[in-house]
Amino acid sequence: MKIGVLALQGDFDAHRQVLERLGADVVMVRKPEQLREIEGLVIPGGESSTFLKLLGDAGFEELRKFVTTKPSFGTCAGAIMLAKQVENPAQKGTGALDIRVRRNAYGRQIESAILTSECSLPGGEMEMVYIRAPRIEEVGPGVEVLAKRDGHPVLVRQGKVLAATFHPELTGDTRVHELFLKMVRNGNSGEK
């Protein structure tokens, strides 16, 4: 199974390491044509506005086509990229996930934290690393909330798309990546 990791900036290498440990064949995606080689895509954390600049209009359109039709997983800035609506400030998202997100809602870099929250994935509680994280302000009717922090969704799934506002790749817990690989294998939303 070939999984792409968008490797333009951000913490893409941490995702590569987790995915390879779980047995995936990982392609570091740096050009739009590489999207044709993969079955699923991870959009890592980083800076969402920088992703937009580095992708350009043509690259963004290729990314949008991929994430709206194939299994995709975004963390932090990747979740912003997958969103239907982005605010603080407003910017475009791919619309692959029916969510409204607020960028940098949990504060500045210095306010980053490692917290534990309840999660509906097998195994219960999950350690979650937040770094200038976005907050999911609203979810559409087809979005399943898998975990919350202070009443706000932090891990959501809709069809073939999975998003986390935290960084599961920075902990030893591989459950979120395992769920994504299961979604890719099943070609759909998978099972918890």
UniProtKB/Swiss-Prot annotation:
One of its GO terms (biological process) is glutamine catabolic process. It catalyses: aldehydo-D-ribose 5-phosphate + D-glyceraldehyde 3-phosphate + L-glutamine = pyridoxal 5'-phosphate + L-glutamate + phosphate + 3 H2O + H(+); L-glutamine + H2O = L-glutamate + NH4(+). The active site is at C76 (nucleophile), H167 (charge relay system), E169 (charge relay system). L-glutamine binds at G46, E47, S48, R103, I131, R132. Pfam families: SNO (PF01174). InterPro entries: Class_I_gatase-like, PdxT/SNO, PdxT/SNO_CS. Gene3D superfamilies: 3.40.50.880. The keyword Hydrolase applies. Keywords: Glutamine amidotransferase, Hydrolase, Lyase, Pyridoxal phosphate. Pathway: Cofactor biosynthesis; pyridoxal 5'-phosphate biosynthesis. Its EC number is 4.3.3.6, 3.5.1.2. GO terms for cellular component: cytosol; glutaminase complex. GO terms for molecular function: glutaminase activity; pyridoxal 5'-phosphate synthase (glutamine hydrolysing) activity. Transmembrane segments: none annotated. Belongs to the glutaminase PdxT/SNO family. In the presence of PdxS, forms a dodecamer of heterodimers. Only shows activity in the heterodimer. Catalyzes the hydrolysis of glutamine to glutamate and ammonia as part of the biosynthesis of pyridoxal 5'-phosphate. The resulting ammonia molecule is channeled to the active site of PdxS. This is Pyridoxal 5'-phosphate synthase subunit PdxT. It comes from Koribacter versatilis (strain Ellin345). The gene is pdxT.
